[in-house]
């Protein structure tokens, strides 16, 4: 599935967050231990199994609190909503509710410099909308009403390694990602329906 798991850490005070822990937990623990970081939070961009598989094991070892969007039906410690701010050391993480791929999808804007988009936006593509709880119209609002309005220089870190590169920028994706081509809502819904066929 080519999942990405990320570790955000403030190197000054050692606080860290693990984003979307799935497989290869030994590697995650190794990086945390090597750097002496204290994991404060586990943050899920959404709660499909491949993004939460490692939650309980990491929480058990690190005592980190699990953060998910309030629409989640999975076990969590801190439900969050659109616009909420979470801090990891000096880093400020702003929650953007970006439903479409799932009802509880959210993107994480860090210090207004980078954004973790989960399965809402990939490099060169976007998340599926043929799964239970997915909705093309909601994805349209998330992509064009929220993600595309972020600063063009913001670096994108997606939930899967499906693109030609592992990262990109908002500006680059607006130029090259066919999903972000300017379309009416109706055209976008037809486009997504044809992609699912």
Provide a role label for each language-model segment.
Residues 102-196:
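Metallo-beta-lactamase
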Residues 1-2, 13-16, 23-94, 175-179, ...:
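Active-site HxH/HxHxD metal-binding segment of metal-dependent hydrolases
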Residues 21, 52, 139-143:
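Aromatic/hydrophobic pocket-lining residues that form the small-molecule binding cavity
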Residues 42-52, 96-104, 156-163:
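Histidine-centered catalytic micro-motifs
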Residues 8, 17-19, 116:
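Conserved catalytic cores of phosphodiester-cleaving nucleases, focusing on short active-site segments
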Residues 9, 81, 99, 171:
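Residue-level detector of conserved, well-ordered beta-strand and adjacent loop positions
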Residues 7, 85-110, 115:
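Core dinuclear metal-dependent hydrolase active-site scaffold
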